[in-house]
A protein has these predicted regions:
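Short, surface-exposed ligand-recognition loops at beta-strand->loop->(often short) alpha-helix junctions
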Residues: 10-22
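Glycine-rich beta-strand-turn "strand-cap" elements at beta-sheet edges
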Residues: 1-6, 10-12, 39-49, 74-98
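Residue-level detection of beta-strand scaffold positions
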Residues: 8, 25, 54-56
Length: 98
């Protein structure tokens, strides 16, 4: 089955919470590893306070399960503490995959 769906989540840390957000994202890797429908999962930092997650799925059921799963719950459960603004979560269609 081809990987055709993804999620891009862009996160802006509150000042002074950059390390805590990075730690949360690192710890989420173990949760992503337990999701068989999440075929690709990356957490990244793109600036001093800018972070994100990119993940990919074979089908909508996998993407929905991920959005309703433990990583989303962990992130949203600490959003007020760690994030300067609500997360920018975008569903994307993958046009080409290597």
């Amino acid at each position: 089955m081809a990987i055709k769906l993804g999620i891009v989540a862009l996160l802006e840390a509150r000042p002074g919470k950059e390390a805590a957000l990075a730690d949360l994202l690192r710890s989420a890797q173990a949760l992503a590893a337990q999701e068989p429908a999440t075929v690709v999962w990356y957490a990244f930092q793109s600036g001093p306070r800018s972070f994100g997650i990119f993940d990919a799925f074979n089908d909508e059921a996998g993407r929905t399960a991920h959005l309703e799963g433990r990583i989303a719950a962990a992130l949203l459960g600490r959003a007020d503490e760690l994030l300067a603004s609500p997360p920018d979560i975008r569903k994307v269609d993958l046009l080409a995959v290597k």
